[in-house]
Design a protein with these regions (language model features):
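Lipid interaction determinants
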Residues: 1-83, 88-90, 94-97, 104-184
Length: 184
């Protein structure tokens, strides 16, 4: 991350805090293209944060492999949020629609997926953060892995990669995994 990106990120955080999260709610409306896995540890324990940062790179690498097997990769995954609280999510060749609720100060988001004939994603509760021009949508690690499993192909390589990620995830409480997007 260069200094310009760091400055944008800091500025967006200041504006978001000053507006009680309303800036994120307003600025998240639009089309977002998937870029990379998102990983965040919510903890007040500095030692745990250091431990988490040590495995974040490996976790992101394994998530990227797992996501690719489920059709989630750059250029093939996007989210669109509308002002009327509806969203469209595309994972590879699969498109899902639904509604969302966003709570500004806590950054909580609830994605209510409409029922599909093949997939039942239900409601996903997570967190949404804007950092400069990037959007992060994160979910409790175990819930995200269940969603990816629903989308994933039943291949041996999927199961092996999922097991590796699950092992890494099991080492941390309050771990959020998800997606990083850039605005289209």
């Amino acid at each position: 991350q260069d200094w310009k990106e760091a400055l944008k990120s800091a500025a967006s955080n200041v504006v978001d805090k000053a507006t009680g999260g309303k800036a994120t709610e307003t600025l998240m409306i639009g089309d977002w293209q998937y870029e990379a896995p998102g990983v965040k540890l919510e903890s007040d324990n500095a030692l745990a944060d250091v431990g988490a940062s040590a495995v974040t790179g490996k976790m992101e690498e394994q998530l990227e492999k797992l996501y690719a097997l489920a059709g989630i990769r750059a250029g093939a995954c996007k989210f669109s949020f509308a002002a009327d609280k509806r969203f469209t999510a595309t994972f590879g060749s699969r498109t899902f629609t639904g509604t969302y609720e966003f709570t500004g100060e806590s950054h909580d988001i609830a994605l209510h997926f409409e029922m599909s004939s093949k997939y039942d994603l239900g409601t996903l509760n997570g967190k949404t953060y804007l950092s400069g021009t990037d959007l992060q949508i994160l979910f409790p690690a175990t819930r995200l892995l269940k969603m990816v499993d629903v989308l994933g192909q039943k291949l041996a390589s999927f199961s092996t990669t999922a097991a590796t990620v699950s092992t890494l995830v099991g080492k941390f409480d309050d771990l959020y995994l998800g997606f990083e997007f850039t605005k289209q």
